[in-house]
Amino acid sequence: MDVLVYGCVNSAVLALMAVGFTLVYGISRLANFAHGALYTLTGFMVWTFLWKLHLNYALAIIIALIMTSIVGAIIYQTLLVRIRGMEASEVIGSFAVGLALMEFLRWKGFIGHAYAVPGFIKGATSIGGVPVDFQRLVIVFAGVIIVIFLWLFTHYTRIGLALRAIAQDEQAGMMLGMDSDKMSMISMSLGAALAGLAAVTIFPLGSITVESGYSVLIYAVAVCIVGGLGSWPGAVVAAFIIGYGQTLTDKFIASHYQAVLAMGAIVVTLILKPSGLFGKQKQLEERV
């Protein structure tokens, strides 16, 4: 029973980590390798607002998410828009931006020990005899809400429909008067905010360091590749597969093999089905 419960929590954590990465790639076909750094940046902003500026918890989160979304838009407008369509340059450029953000955090003094913030809700409950703290339930709830919100946003709002149109056929969308670069900037900004939302939701479970961005990026990429780049249903399914795999690894082998499992999932997927579980082979061939 503990595998079932904690596997669900781990899956929600991975889904939260990956949904922003999936959104950006699905719309702009841009692999944002600064995703992990944006996650870390948001976590440290919340920590600073709470412990240095003594802001209200909710206000600290809102300000941090707004600032992270602005940073995402700036990254796109100042760099990525100039190299869009050049796959190698996109990967190298976005990864370099991520490294710069993490070095900025180190320069600001976030080095050495790990940093922590309190949970939203204290206390615990029992599910099927398995003790689960309320913060983990918040993560599961947040994952469900975010997936539902994104589906409603992309199906019932003007901007969301425009984003879907650009994702499905960029040339046709531009012929209808849509600004492809503007839509990509919006997706990058929203993806950055989602990375930040994952941080503020997951951060209270433990602690965060500057290096946390690397592991978040690895897990986000693993989920997206296994599920199919740009596929939200695929990302959710892949999050459950890897999440439960990590739980079983932790229970029967050792917790430090969880990252190995994620990397192994990437390798196996690229060998057996390069387009991923829900990816489209035709789109993959067009990219290659």
What are these regions (language model features)?
Residues 82-156, 183, 248, 253, ...:
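Transmembrane helix-bundle core of multi-pass membrane transporters
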Residues 128-209, 232-237:
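Helix-loop-helix "hairpin" substructures at the membrane interface of multi-pass membrane proteins
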Residues 1-17, 45, 53-60, 86-91, ...:
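Membrane-interfacial amphipathic/re-entrant helices at transmembrane-helix boundaries
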Residues 21, 54-97, 104, 237-242, ...:
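Alpha-helical transmembrane segments within multi-pass membrane transporters and channels
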Residues 1-13, 132, 153-158, 184-227, ...:
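Inter-helical junctions in multi-pass inner-membrane proteins, predominant
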Residues 5, 27-74, 207:
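Membrane-embedded helix boundary and interhelical linker motif in transport proteins
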